[in-house]
């Protein structure tokens, strides 16, 4: 109780601060009243009434704008031209005065005025700063965005700060998009969250004319856009058939096609068509039927696996894998849909039509 009382008392008297417990920026909410603030009850069931404080936004004391930051008029007058000469640095003003044969008085008069304007600026800013820090003002209720938006406009007087902020926001949004969707199509630049989505896009959009596009990209010595430059780097990792170049080693035993380090026997590698990772069928625990089936389609590893019907890898916890061909299917994409994964082995409709009674689902049940 004492700790909470001290914490609440500290929050009531301190300036806005970042609470380390909740991570919230605490501000003075003016809910703490004293006995002298009590008034008579105005409605049945009330004991006291307290005066309400109407919220008002702080009227900022803007320092006088430096005339050097003001926009020039469209039709310059002779008097304004003389004023501008006083605002130019000393070397430039004296040089122009000599060239125009102006008297020395015109060069001397603007100097103290500039000095006064420069000396008045910090004094006014100090007084404005004192007024900002007064406890009676309601600056606590102002958002930080008010300061961030108004301060650059008052200081520079140009729209340059706004443009920079907008460009920075666009860059941040682009960086977030790149981070959320790291896999980009090397032909059209479309981005995906995972590699299976990108491979599905390749298979249905660019697989037919990928060879011709690859030949045209090789002729260009200097690609016009960074996307095309990135596409050439990615195309170098793909074969002429659009498949990823396979690794020459097994991801599980680190052996190659000549030696399986688990069995010390030569064994052919099976490679993923999307990422190029390879593995021995025995390391992948493939059956002989599955070893023959994976050679007939674009096989995908477990990390790149997507549904053979909808082509996406979303809801991978709903994917069923065929025990005969290792294809993946969403349980809700099947016809009819399946609510729970079946017990034992399961065969897809393609393997049931091809293998008939030799499918794994019948072998396990018999």
Swiss-Prot record:
Annotated region (Disordered) at: 41-94, 140-167, 211-243
Keywords of the record, alphabetical order, are:
Apoptosis, Cytoplasm, Metal-binding, Nucleus, Repeat, Transcription, Transcription regulation, Zinc, Zinc-finger
Q: Sorted alphabetically, which InterPro entries does this protein's record hold? A: DPF1-3_N, Znf_C2H2_sf, Znf_C2H2_type, Znf_FYVE_PHD, Znf_PHD, Znf_PHD-finger, Znf_RING/FYVE/PHD
Q: Name one GO molecular function term.
A: zinc ion binding
Protein's cellular compartments: Cytoplasm; Nucleus
Its signal peptide is: none
Q: Does the keyword Transcription apply?
A: yes
In the record, the note on similarity to other proteins reads: Belongs to the requiem/DPF family.
* The name this protein goes by in its record: Zinc finger protein ubi-d4 B
Query: Mind giving the lineage of the organism this protein is from?
Result: Eukaryota, Metazoa, Chordata, Craniata, Vertebrata
> Gene name?
req-b
